[in-house]
Structures are given as structure tokens and as C-alpha cells.
């Protein structure tokens, strides 16, 4: 007789646990719901919501410069700013940590063009206070796909539009092709490198109907046998579904499914069940 306490969790149980952890992740002090500002700095200026005067550094230097008095209570790398301090960017081997208060922190990000922005997180943001849940489809085994993975030597460059880039594209390296057939339709998808994973940005027949209109993300890793598993139950909402201060990539044409993919996350909901952000 099997002891229920020691029985192997079902796929559905594992998915439920994954979803709970996902909801916890977005309300962390630097989770997606905590981002309250992303301000690109091209000249000396103040930044909404935080003290100090911020300025770019000389070309080739990583980060920003902040000018402040002790009364501003800006702490960079554990030191209270009194005068000016260099805040190293994410592209530096040792990026700086910034604290403005017990709940508000900052971090400097970099663009491919060498521009820098201050991101500000608030562990007590309006988004965190209003958050109710991430609405999602129930586990759907029909959308666990084993696809063929074909590596492309040197990769191929694909232009991805971004939500706030007014139609311009950013070049991303796609290191291989993802191909499969489902219900008589052939697919050839483009996923770009994102850290150690591949990031698939896609839209489908549910986008703007029952799921977030911008699209969704799926993070992947090729298998040693030349296949790649697409478990769309793990499809997540992009960060811009949680905060308007993110600029998310949009699905290229080849990643736009005409059919509905009724698996994965749908929308971010407030405590009262309404959408957190009107799209």
C-alpha cells in the first residue's frame, strides 16, 4: 500500500508548486512588481522618486555618477554618499548596489549602445500592494512539445522589436532552429540566448483575448539528443505585464501562432480579480 505522504508528486502537483513559487518571485524586493522607475541618463538630472542628482560618466566608463548630501540618505556599496560617488553598471564585473531607504533600492543597467539607466525598486510598491494572483490555465499536456533542435554554427542575427522602441529592432543572436509539426502545421521558431537559457518570445490565438496582448515568454534548454522540449505550461508573462517600467521584446513573425495555446500564464490580477494593468 502506498503511503500518500511519500508518493511521487503528479505532473499537476509539480505544476501547482511551480506556479506558487512563480507568484512569490514577482513580489520579492526586486521582483517584477517592485520596479517603479527606469530612467535613462544622458545628461545631469534628477530622477523621479529618488533623491540626488545623476549624470553619465565619460565615454567608456561603466555606470553613473550621483551627487548628494548625507541628508539624501543614498548608500552606494555600503557607503553613505557625501558629495559624489560612482555607481557601477550591470556591465561591470562588480556592479554597485544602491539603497535609498529600507524598502527602496536601485541598480544601474546598460544598453548595447553604452547608455545607462537607473532602475528603482520599491518593496512596498503599489503593484505589490494590489497584487492578487497570476491567472493561468490549468495544466495542459497537449502543449508539451518535443521539437527538433538544429544548432546554427555562429548563430544567425534576428531583429526583435521592443515595446517602447517605436518600431526599431534590436539584434539578437539565435543559435539554432526549433522545428516541429502540430495538428498539420509546421513551425520554425526563433529563440535568442538569455543567460544560460534560450528565450522564446511568442504570441498566439489567446493573445489579447484571454492572455496578455503583448505575448509571453518560454525559457528553454536543448537536450543532448538533439531535441528541445517546449512545455508551454511554463509560459510566463513578460515583466512589462507587471510594471510599465520594463521594455519587453515582441514576438517576431515566425513566433506568432495562429492557434490558441491554452497553457501557461494568462494575466496579472489584482486582489479583486480585475486586471492589474489595462493593456
Feature locations, PLM:
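Short strand-coil-strand connectors
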Residues: 48-50, 77, 101-103, 181-185, ...
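Forkhead-associated
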Residues: 41-89
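N-terminal cleavable signal peptides for secretion/export
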Residues: 3-51
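Long, compositionally biased interface segments
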Residues: 9, 17-19, 26, 221-279
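Surface-exposed beta-loop interaction hotspot
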Residues: 103-172
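Broad, structure-driven detector of short, well-ordered beta-strand segments within folded domains
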Residues: 52-57, 62, 103-110, 187-191
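Phosphate/adenylate-binding glycine loop and adjacent helical scaffold
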Residues: 79-81, 85-86, 90-106, 114, ...
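Acidic/His-leaning functional-site neighborhoods
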Residues: 176-224, 233
Amino acid at each position: 500500500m502506498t503511503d500518500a505522504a511519500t508518493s511521487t508528486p503528479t505532473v499537476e502537483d509539480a505544476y501547482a508548486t511551480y506556479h506558487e513559487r512563480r507568484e512569490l518571485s514577482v513580489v520579492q524586493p526586486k521582483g517584477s512588481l517592485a520596479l517603479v522607475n527606469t530612467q535613462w541618463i544622458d545628461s545631469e538630472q534628477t530622477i523621479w522618486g529618488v533623491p540626488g542628482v545623476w549624470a553619465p560618466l565619460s565615454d567608456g566608463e561603466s555606470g553613473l555618477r550621483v551627487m548628494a548630501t548625507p541628508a539624501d540618505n543614498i548608500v552606494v556599496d555600503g557607503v553613505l554618499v557625501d558629495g559624489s560617488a560612482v555607481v557601477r553598471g550591470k556591465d561591470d564585473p562588480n556592479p554597485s548596489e544602491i539603497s535609498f531607504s529600507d524598502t527602496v533600492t536601485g541598480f544601474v543597467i546598460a544598453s548595447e549602445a553604452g547608455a545607462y539607466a537607473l532602475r528603482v525598486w520599491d518593496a512596498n510598491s503599489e503593484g505589490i500592494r494590489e497584487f492578487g494572483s497570476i491567472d493561468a490555465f490549468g495544466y495542459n499536456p497537449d502543449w508539451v512539445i518535443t521539437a527538433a533542435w538544429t544548432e546554427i554554427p555562429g548563430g544567425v542575427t534576428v531583429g526583435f522589436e521592443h515595446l517602447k522602441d517605436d518600431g526599431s529592432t534590436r539584434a539578437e543572436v539565435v543559435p539554432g532552429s526549433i522545428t516541429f509539426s502540430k495538428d498539420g502545421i509546421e513551425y520554425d521558431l526563433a529563440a535568442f540566448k538569455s543567460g544560460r537559457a534560450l528565450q522564446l518570445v511568442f504570441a498566439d490565438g489567446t493573445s489579447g483575448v484571454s492572455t496578455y496582448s503583448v505575448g509571453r515568454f518560454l525559457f528553454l534548454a536543448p537536450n543532448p539528443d538533439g531535441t528541445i522540449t517546449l512545455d508551454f505550461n511554463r509560459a510566463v508573462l513578460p515583466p512589462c505585464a507587471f510594471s510599465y517600467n520594463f521594455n519587453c521584446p515582441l514576438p517576431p513573425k515566425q513566433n506568432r501562432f495562429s492557434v490558441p495555446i491554452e497553457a501557461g500564464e494568462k494575466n496579472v490580477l489584482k486582489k479583486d480579480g480585475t486586471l492589474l494593468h489595462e493593456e
